[in-house]
From Swiss-Prot:
Bilayer-crossing regions: 9-29, 32-52, 61-81, 90-110, 145-165
Gene3D superfamilies associated with the record: NADH-ubiquinone/plastoquinone oxidoreductase chain 6, subunit NuoJ
Subunit description: NDH is composed of at least 16 different subunits, 5 of which are encoded in the nucleus.
Protein known as: NAD(P)H-quinone oxidoreductase subunit 6, organellar chromatophore
One cellular component term from this protein's GO annotations in UniProt: plastid
EC identifiers of the protein: 7.1.1.-
Reaction(s) catalysed by this chain's protein: a plastoquinone + NADH + (n+1) H(+)(in) = a plastoquinol + NAD(+) + n H(+)(out); a plastoquinone + NADPH + (n+1) H(+)(in) = a plastoquinol + NADP(+) + n H(+)(out)
InterPro entries: NADH_UbQ/plastoQ_OxRdtase_su6 (IPR001457), Nuo/plastoQ_OxRdtase_6_NuoJ (IPR042106)
UniProt-recorded Gene Ontology molecular function terms: NADH dehydrogenase (ubiquinone) activity; quinone binding
PANTHER family hit by this protein: NADH-UBIQUINONE OXIDOREDUCTASE CHAIN 6
Segments forming a coiled coil: none
Amino acid sequence: MTISNATQLICFFALSATLILGALGVVLLPNIVYSAFLLGSVFLSVAGLYLLLNASFVAAAQVLIYVGAVNVLILFAIMLVNREEELKVIPGLAIRRFFSGVVCMGLLVILERIATTTHWAQVGPIPLGEEATIRIGEHLFSDYLLPFELASILLLIAMIGAIVLARKDLVDLKPIIEQRIDPKEIKLPSSSMFRKKSKKLTDMG
């Protein structure tokens, strides 16, 4: 085993361990903000695995789209919408965790069986190199144009939903419920109010 192969093997195990531990943290940690940050580490670990496979374009897309867009959007939504409220205890939580663990172990066994019994295609003798990015672009905007546009629409819908939820938190809904006030009479906070608040924070800093 050469030094380069040994280094690649060490990087693979390190990235795999980071990915697995981060994924477990996303599911098991009670703090949703920590889970969102660990989700970003999972995305970065996947990008590192892509780099080990010489797929630099896919790794860059992973970082730009999932870390730079999706994960940041999730963090903004959590920090804008997150309310400190006590969650109700889920009945039968231990039984649900047990069955969830059984299902996960079953999926793991199935994936391991597929990975060991499938005859995978051999890597070609000539790597694509820089032409790989060109071919990905050609397929992305020709054969896979519809899924590409659908993904962009889903991201746009997620952004609009986060903005709508954040705007709802700025409006006091208690008078509407108690006094039955017409929602049309409620004035939303204006942009000047946000500028005044930001100016005060800047002066305080």
